[in-house]
């Protein structure tokens, strides 16, 4: 991502995003969700007489895990990424950085990853197009609602 970060405003956007993950305790949420999903799958497997394990043996892969990842965990992770994007813009704006650079970063990332991005449903992150759209939709509100903090 540093290749797409061209200046201090861009660096502030990336740092704001990462700080937002910490402030929002996203790693704790992910661990809790993974534990819940794994425990639920084990209980279903036990109460179904091993049917989930049988599916995995029959297909030769962790089909249940893949379905869980795509259907439950990835959408949850994408939501966290979008939340971190939004909070990161707020943190950057409050700190006096130009948050318009956030969109420019994702435009550059889109170009750098051209043809390499997986379909969004298979990714833990929103697509560059969706990120750019969402950031643009929230930009003016963040600029108006979260002006730089004046320290005197």
Enumerate the predicted regions with their spans.
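A Zn2+-metalloprotease active-site environment signal
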Residues: 1-152
């Amino acid at each position: 991502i540093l290749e797409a970060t061209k200046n201090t405003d861009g660096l502030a956007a990336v740092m704001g995003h990462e700080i937002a993950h910490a402030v929002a305790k996203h790693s704790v949420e992910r661990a809790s969700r993974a534990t819940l999903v794994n425990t639920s799958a084990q209980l279903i497997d036990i109460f179904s007489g091993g049917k989930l394990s049988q599916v995995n043996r029959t297909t030769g892969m962790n089909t249940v895990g893949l379905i869980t990842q795509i259907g439950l965990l990835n959408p949850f992770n994408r939501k966290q990424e979008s939340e971190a994007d939004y909070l990161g813009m707020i943190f950057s704006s409050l700190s006096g950085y130009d948050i318009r650079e956030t969109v420019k970063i994702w435009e550059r990332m889109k170009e750098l990853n051209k043809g390499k991005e997986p379909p969004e449903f298979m990714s833990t992150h929103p697509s560059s197009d969706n990120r750019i759209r969402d950031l643009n939709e929230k930009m003016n509100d963040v600029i108006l609602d979260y002006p730089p903090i004046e320290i005197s």
